[in-house]
Every structure is written in C-alpha cells, then in structure tokens.
A protein has these predicted regions:
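Histidine-centered beta-alpha loop that forms part of the nucleotide-sugar donor binding/catalytic region
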Residues: 12, 73, 138-139
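Residues that recognize and position ribonucleotide moieties
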Residues: 16, 105, 182
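Conserved core of the sugar-phosphate nucleotidyltransferase
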Residues: 84, 88, 112-194
Length: 194
C-alpha cells in the first residue's frame, strides 16, 4: 500500500467545557503531544498537519516538527463541523491541480489514548474494504437506548424505546464513536461540499 495519507491533528483553542484541554499537561507532557506521538508511530501516514486557531497548539506542533495551519475563525467555533476544517487543511497544503493524498486521517488533539497500531489498522481497513470511511467505535454496553428513559411533564418516567428486553445478553449490538480515529478517502471528503 504505497498511497499518500495525510493526518490532520485538530485542536480548537476555545473549548467551553475544559479551556485549553489540548495543551494541558498530562503525565509530564501536553495532551496533544500524545497524538503527535501516535502520528509518529504510524507506518502509513505520509504527512501530518496541525490545524488550530490557538497559538500554543500551533507552537507545540512546530516544536514537534509538524506543519501547522492557522485555522480561520469561522472554522474554529464551538459549532464548526469537522469536514470543512479537513477540506481547508487539504486545500491549504495541496493547491489546485496538485496531487492529493488518497486518504485523510482526522485526529482530535484532545484524545491522548489510542491503542497501539489503531491508526494503521483503520487506514488498512479503508483501503482493503473499498469503503469511503472508517472510524473507531465502542459498544454502548449497558448505556443502551433500550434501557434509557424519558421523563414526562408530570415527572414520571417511561422507556425511551418501547421493548421487552431485560437481560444484557438480549440487547441488540449498538456502537458509539470514540473519537480516536477517523479515516476517509480524500475524494469523498472533497466531494462532500455543503
């Protein structure tokens, strides 16, 4: 598999829940530093860029020897979608008509833990299956919608999804994104304008 793969490490500076979370120290290094390490461990990533509106994130990216792109303010709000950020990064690095990578790996800079080889397994799965994208997921386990409740106006609760499932073993398998790794074909990413 000799195809170019671009990793885009994304970290916004304006987090409301935990300001500066990507640059906070965790066991002696900034949280985003763990993502930089994961990128370096990949055998398949051929280029990496850090996309951020935060000067400290960009500084850390430069210190790690990575390319950096200052993200425009309109792509750095709490409601900004990720695809436009990824498209911005690809277009900033590869001009019109230039050869572009076959795939883009989106990595959140505030995710310090990823299993060994996880990024490469996702990239390999993308190319081996011919699918448009791959993302990491985890079982919802006991937090299954079948076992969730709505609260009515009078304060009583009722099952959110009507069902007669009482044993965990009988729950249909459902999964939730972990946010650890997203990989997509560049042509699909760029074709999904709008």
């Amino acid at each position: 598999m000799a195809q170019d793969v671009l990793a885009v490490v994304m970290a916004r500076g304006g987090s409301v829940g935990l300001p500066g979370k990507a640059v906070r120290m965790l066991l002696g290094k900034p949280v985003i530093g763990y993502t930089f390490g994961h990128v370096r461990e990949s055998r398949l990533i051929t280029g990496t860029v850090v996309s951020s509106d935060d000067a400290e994130v960009l500084r850390l990216g430069r210190e790690a020897g990575l390319e950096v792109i200052e993200r425009p303010a309109e792509l750095a709000t709490a409601t900004s979608a990720t695809d436009p950020v990824l498209r911005h990064a690809v277009r900033a690095l590869y001009g019109e008509g230039a050869a572009r990578p076959a795939a883009v790996v989106m990595l959140y800079g505030n995710v310090p833990v990823r299993r060994n080889g996880m990024i490469d397994r996702c990239i390999e799965m993308l190319f081996a299956t011919g699918c448009d994208s791959v993302q990491t997921v985890a079982s919802v386990g006991k937090m299954h919608p079948y076992w969730m409740f709505d609260r009515k106006e009078d304060g009583r609760i009722r099952k959110h999804v009507a069902n007669d499932v009482f044993r965990r073993q009988d729950l249909p398998a459902l999964f939730s994104p972990t946010g650890a790794v997203y990989v997509m074909r560049t042509e699909v990413l760029l074709g999904g304008e709008g």
